[in-house]
Amino acid sequence: GATTVIFEGIPSYPTHSRFWEVIQKHRVNQFYTAPTAIRSLAKEKIEYVRDYRLDSLKVIGSVGEPINEEAWHWYNDHVGNKRCPLVDTWWQTETGSIMIAPLPGVTTLKPGCATNPLFGIEPLVCLEDRTVCKPGEDGRLFIKKPWPSQARTIWGDHQRYMDTYWN
């Protein structure tokens, strides 16, 4: 099994070391937070991070919004000490699971990029008219086919599912 530590509140109260205190005290192996928190903490004195033992960390992660390259590097360099894979994930509540993310120790990491679709996910980038974009062209993200965590019915009441979500 695994122990989960759930953190409540803001990362800067009562001190800007709050995250790092929790990691040190509980010997956290995987730490997952939002880029907004990272950007906020990166503005503070580096001692807030440096004064704590974070060597228990094996993987650090980012979730909730795109992470910019500057925040990615600060998180990787000062929290992960350039030794922990930084898993930048993309998903939405509606998708039911992470859809695009690197595989720690396998995928080459790219600052500010969630990298590759996970197994069973077929993303497409399309224009407004739903034609597939050319490489390097901006567009909207679509998922081509149903994915493993997609809700496709309500157990024992498919009509309710259709009426609630599609009609």
Residues covered by each model-derived region:
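ATP-dependent adenylate-forming carboxylate-activation enzymes
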Residues: 4-22
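Nucleotide phosphate-binding site architecture
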Residues: 12, 38-39, 151, 162
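Gly/Ser/Thr-rich phosphate-binding loop
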Residues: 2-3, 20, 28-33, 42-109, ...
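Hydrophobic alpha-helical scaffolding
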Residues: 9-13, 26-31, 61-65, 112-113, ...
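Conserved ATP/PPi-binding loop(s) of AMP-dependent carboxylate-activating enzymes
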Residues: 116-120, 131-166
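Short, P/G- and charge-enriched loop/turn segments at secondary-structure junctions
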Residues: 106-113, 164
